[in-house]
Amino acid sequence: MIQAIELGKVAVLYGGNSSEREISLIGGRAVHAALCAAGIDAHLLDTGDPNRIWTLKDEHFSRAFVMLHGRGGEDGEIQAILQWLGIPYTGSRVLACALAMDKVVCKKVWQSAGLPVLADVLVTPESRFETLVEQLHCQDFVIKPALEGSSVGVSRVKNQEQLAAAIPFAGGARAKIMAEPWIVGRELTYGIVNDTVLPAIEIVAGNDHDFYDYDAKYHAANTQYLCPAPIDAALDARCREIAFAAFQAIGARGWGRVDMIVDAQNRPYLLEINLVPGMTTHSLVPMAAQQIGMDFSALVQSILAQTLTS
């Protein structure tokens, strides 16, 4: 385990101004508590005030643990500021964060690397359901904002009326919105810490949810998390390989989580990658880490230790 004196004064960056602020606040507090319990000189810093980040040098912070989700914190913006300030920080660098944040661009990178992804098309307020049917060759879609996380603004659409409601829910005319085919299958997620792919988790939403949406993630009591996922060894090996290749393809480093869906024919498709995964009581990376004997404190310290060699 790392020595507290090696780390100096640590800023836990949390909060921010994205749609995922509340989740970031919870995760940031959990990380801060774990660091303090380990004797590390850690301090919470809410970047909801955009000027606050610029005081890190003046306040003699040695490094930063980034627990910001969504735009402004997970898209490369805060990472660029930290690099300019010369402060080591957890997780991926600017380009990888920017790629991961934009689901459309990220999928193009994965596709160019030969990794399996679902077809997608961009959606605007003028989009028609019949056109999407022709473009994606199916009659059941997922509509989602390309630049949000935590399943914010995601809808399942089966007709024009539902499409008309889904577009403003995903952000409307100002947002970059995408449509993908609805796949009936098993949702798997793989955490990655220090180039180690953690055991798979299968996510099973309750019968009252069509899919693993924001409510199922953070509020529903009947969402199941099966860890390790009950899948056969060959499929698990294939999915682990895909997850790590997806992580590497965008130049990610440190830690992250890769989400995918496996269809009825056991074909995996990448959905998205999260480079600042949640660290709440519902969060998946801590759950998977426990399966290899890494408790929350050890996980947090392992992630922070990456800043000593970055």
Curated annotation (Swiss-Prot):
Cofactor(s) listed: Mg(2+); Mn(2+)
Residues that hold ATP according to the record: 134-189
Keywords: ATP-binding, Cell shape, Cell wall biogenesis/degradation, Cytoplasm, Ligase, Magnesium, Manganese, Metal-binding, Nucleotide-binding, Peptidoglycan synthesis
Listed Gene3D superfamilies: 3.40.50.20, ATP-grasp fold, A domain, ATP-grasp fold, B domain
GO molecular function: ATP binding; D-alanine-D-alanine ligase activity; metal ion binding
EC number: 6.3.2.4
Binding-site residues for Mg(2+) 2, renumbered to this chain: 272, 274
Binding residue positions for Mg(2+) 1: 259, 272
Family as reported in the entry's similarity comment: Belongs to the D-alanine--D-alanine ligase family.
Name recorded for this polypeptide: D-alanine--D-alanine ligase
Gene: ddl
